[in-house]
Amino acid sequence: MKKIIIASNNQNKIREIKQILKEFDFNIVSLKEENIDIDVEEDGKTFIENAYKKAYEIYKMRKDCMVIADDSGLTVDELEGAPGIYSARFAGIHGDDKKNNEKLLSLLEGVPFEKRNAQFVCSIVLIIDEANSIKVEGEISGFITDKEIGTKGFGYDPLFYVPEFKKTFAELTEDEKNSISHRAIALEKLCSEMKKLNWGE
């Protein structure tokens, strides 16, 4: 069975990717399961550049496997696209959700709800071999609330309000989120591209 390494140790992300790709007959594993300890510098100027760099650095170590990597983040119109590619380290420390959310709320203080438009963006790269890769992007639009609402999810989820559900991402069930999230949209596009290679069904 062909192996796909997910270039992440984020358990939430790994679970979401495995769930959406379960129709394919692949052994999908995390970096930890492969005993890979690597910290790739995300110095690209776009989400897709960072995703490709992460995937390729790991592919160079395990050329017998395929590698899937994503880079995702939040873009806020009022902040000219920030936090963007710096979403995970917006407040200075990588992955400090609480501090990142506090900084975002403070920058948007006084901005009316209708001007708090935001997008969650996810770029995914699957490196198949040295010459072939698939690149896809998913996006969902919403608004930034003025306080954290909900306890599910991670990252900016408690601040990202989805008009379609009248809830934040952190109030959605896993199934609801997987049906509309930026990562779900990108993964569905990835599935479509993979099926063209006769990997599915």
From Swiss-Prot:
Entry EC no(s): 3.6.1.66
Reactions the enzyme catalyzes: XTP + H2O = XMP + diphosphate + H(+); dITP + H2O = dIMP + diphosphate + H(+); ITP + H2O = IMP + diphosphate + H(+)
Positions annotated to bind substrate: 8-13, 72, 154-157, 177, 182-183
Keyword Cytoplasm attached: no
Gene3D superfamilies: 3.90.950.10
Ligand binding (Mg(2+)): 41, 71
A single GO molecular function term of this UniProt record: ITP diphosphatase activity
GO cellular component: cytosol
Cofactors required: Mg(2+)
InterPro entries: dITP/XTP_pyrophosphatase, ITPase-like_fam, RdgB/HAM1
Keyword tags: Hydrolase, Magnesium, Metal-binding, Nucleotide metabolism, Nucleotide-binding
Disulfide bonds: none
GO BP term, pick one: nucleotide metabolic process
Uppermost EC category: hydrolase
Residues the record marks as active site: 71 (proton acceptor)
Cofactor descriptive note: Binds 1 Mg(2+) ion per subunit.
Family from the record: Belongs to the HAM1 NTPase family.
Subunit text: Homodimer.
Entry function: Pyrophosphatase that catalyzes the hydrolysis of nucleoside triphosphates to their monophosphate derivatives, with a high preference for the non-canonical purine nucleotides XTP (xanthosine triphosphate), dITP (deoxyinosine triphosphate) and ITP. Seems to function as a house-cleaning enzyme that removes non-canonical purine nucleotides from the nucleotide pool, thus preventing their incorporation into DNA/RNA and avoiding chromosomal lesions.
PANTHER family attached to this UniProt entry: INOSINE TRIPHOSPHATE PYROPHOSPHATASE, INOSINE TRIPHOSPHATE PYROPHOSPHATASE/HAM1 PROTEIN
Protein's name according to its UniProt entry: dITP/XTP pyrophosphatase
